[in-house]
Amino acid sequence: MVPKPLSLLLFLLLALSAAVVGGRKLVAAGGWRPIESLNSAEVQDVAQFAVSEHNKQANDELQYQSVVRGYTQVVAGTNYRLVIAAKDGAVVGNYEAVVWDKPWMHFRNLTSFRKV
């Protein structure tokens, strides 16, 4: 039987090592993680898809400008939650888009799109 102080120490060490791995904080499964590289080709492609798909669905004419911030969530594929700057006529506004992406199936779906 392990003495109680040693058991407590082992528990604390285990909890600490589980909280930080490789200098990175762990995110709960299914949690949203900030996107580190907003200018990556993948993120830009998803953002442009979101604006284009919104324009088709809403018969709108927004023009993509940039990604302001974004998060990903691992599901059966990846959810992207992006704040996108887009031009509506002469006015640039921010819009939040959620896109579900499964690249191995060539599947991409605009889940939501709204002005923020």
From Swiss-Prot:
Belongs to the cystatin family. Phytocystatin subfamily. This is Cysteine proteinase inhibitor 1. A motif (Secondary area of contact) lies at residues 73-77. Residues 30-89 form the Cystatin domain. Specific inhibitor of papain family cysteine proteinases. Inhibits papain, chymopapain, bromelain, ficin, human cathepsins B, H and L, actinidain and house dustmite endopeptidase 1, but does not inhibit human bleomycin hydrolase. Inhibits papain with an IC(50) of 2.47 nM. Does not inhibit cysteine proteinases belonging to other families including clostripain, streptopain and calpain. It is found in: Secreted. Keywords: Allergen, Glycoprotein, Plant defense, Protease inhibitor, Secreted, Signal, Thiol protease inhibitor. GO terms for molecular function: cysteine-type endopeptidase inhibitor activity. Glycosylated. One of its GO terms (biological process) is defense response. Transmembrane segments: none annotated. It holds the Pfam family SQAPI. Residues 1-26 form the signal peptide. One of its GO terms (cellular component) is extracellular region. CDD domains: CY.
